[in-house]
Amino acid sequence: MSRLTIITKDKAQVTMESLYQDLERRIVASPPGLCTIDLTRSFIKMCLAQSCGKCVPCRVGLRQLARLFDDVLDGNATEETLDVIRLTAEGIYYSADCAIGYEAAKLVLKCIDGCEDDFRSHMERGFCSCNSNQPVACVKSCPAGVDIPGYIALVHEGRYADAVRLIRRDNPMPTTCAYICEHPCENRCKRTLIDAPVNIRGLKKMAVDNAGDVPVPACNEPTGKKVAIIGGGPGGLSAAYYLALMGHKVTIFEQRKQLGGMLRYGIPNYRLPRKKLDAEINAILSTGIEVKKNISVGTDITLEDINKEYNAVYISIGAHADKKIGIDGEDATTGVTSAVEMLRAIGDDEMPDYTGKRVVVIGGGNVAMDVARSSVRLGAEKVSIVYRRRKADMTALPEEVEGAEAEGCDVLELMSPVRIEKDENDAAVGLWVQPQMISRIKGGRPSPKTAAKDEVLIPCDLIVVAIGQGIETRYFEEHGFTVKRGTIEALDTSEIKERKGIFAGGDCVTGPATVIRAIAAGKVAAANIDEYLGYHHEITSDVEIPYAGYEDKVPCGRVEVALRDAADRKKDFEPIEYGFSCEEACQESGRCLRCDHFGFGSFRGGREKQW
């Protein structure tokens, strides 16, 4: 008789693992607008199925919670029911033996604290209001609310110009977003239920690269109203575009010599080609927008002067101030610079020469990756990225980190900068770092703490600090604007309290964010400025979206955007991505499930909010 046997998976185990994978995909693809109470009940029942049954709080308590949630969803609950749910969850949380019990209870407590209105809706009206407002997941996830299923259907038919026209209804910078958008729309794509999310950004790139010159829509009749935009970045350009289409006279005041903001002075050409950016900006300006460059508000002109001449003002200054890391030696005469300073020089075509230099980049965001990859292209002999957390904790997009590593950059994770080593000429010659270890999770991210290891010296010729950007708000604060944590305080309508006719949005309100969020802020501001001026213009599109017919959506692999070989692309600043072929675009666009016609989204045409 054998003492041991090799464990092999039986049919039931294989089936269970397949079910787990299906469940994981379904959770990832959960659309916005779901009933939180119903979702929590489902989670409780799943936890109950996982329970071993040995401890009473888990075995009995979870079953009791499931029954109480059934009462809420059936409209049979009262205030007393809510109290019992809380007490039961607290009892499980503090007495369950393992995470199956107390993590389930923790979720219930979180649901009660954050969704009290949903509970009351079920108790008082017998239904959840969110069930009647469940939009298309990708449209809801896009900050600008672009009709994504619509333009994917147009790409599928090869109607690229129409796709661009449809995108412009909600986003005046389709080319920019086709190249560098963080594509949050893909995160909740319902196609994940079958295999993988649709490559939405890749399809948008297919449209803009093949559409040719697409004229902007005709502007409405002039209203006689004048609007000033302070800042010519993506947010300011977005607001200016829509306001001009509405018939208002728009003037942009730009501090630098060229428009584009961080698109020009923060995004290298290999990610966003300058020719593409210039063409997109020129298309926006073709609506009749006036531009005044090299004008700094507060120095060359005052806000009071602008306010007197214009009927409304939109402040959309970006995050162009660098942040100091605050360590000894950062004041070195040479060898230390900021990401903002470096990328700004590149944006002005003033390319620094890093030939043969050892460069250390401090930071873990997209800007840090841009700096590192640009340093390689500028001739650096060695590029090291220093980050105090793990690589998995970096805020940079995974593809950016992978791209940096493929181009030869070293990622030194769990290394916290301590001080900068200087020579007798006050030049930086190295960075001292302290090894870290991951500790408790705070605010959703693990916190690093000092490891019991010696400090390490990283020899280098240049240190680039890329730990974030700040907003230059001093002038506005001195003129009575409320500034909290370095940002201007504004309402969600972009209005400034007690400052009639002045609006603000984008990075100067939210802090440094993504391009699509700045564009969305400009769109919101334009609509509310238009209303403030006494109008209610709507931006429409006469593009006819193809009919969504029934078809069998079988599993099909996702088509990825191909990249130039790392060994070649790191030698220049030329674009690194190839576009889809017609065959690839047709296959990938055919994977779209058309949630604007099938599912809850069909009740609202796929759009949560109209202009």
Identify the role of each PLM range:
Residues M1-C130:
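Redox cofactor-anchoring modules in respiratory/redox and cofactor-processing assemblies
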Residues K45-R67, E90-L107, N131-G150, P172-L193, ...:
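Local cysteine-cluster metal-coordination motifs and their immediate loop/turn environment
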Residues M206-N220, N282-T299, D322-L378, V483-R499:
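Glycine-rich dinucleotide-binding loop and its adjacent helix/turn
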Residues E221, K226-A228, D278-I327, R419-W432, ...:
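Feature captures the FAD/FMN-dependent oxidoreductase FAD-binding
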Residues K226-K249, A368-V376:
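N-terminal Rossmann-like FAD-binding beta1-loop-alpha1 element of flavoenzymes
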Residues I252, R256-T287, V291, I346, ...:
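Rossmann-like dinucleotide-binding cores of NAD(P)H-dependent redox enzymes
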Residues T334-G356, E424, I441-P512, K553:
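FAD-site-proximal beta/loop scaffold in flavoenzymes
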Residues C508-I539:
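A conserved FAD-binding loop/helix module that cradles the flavin
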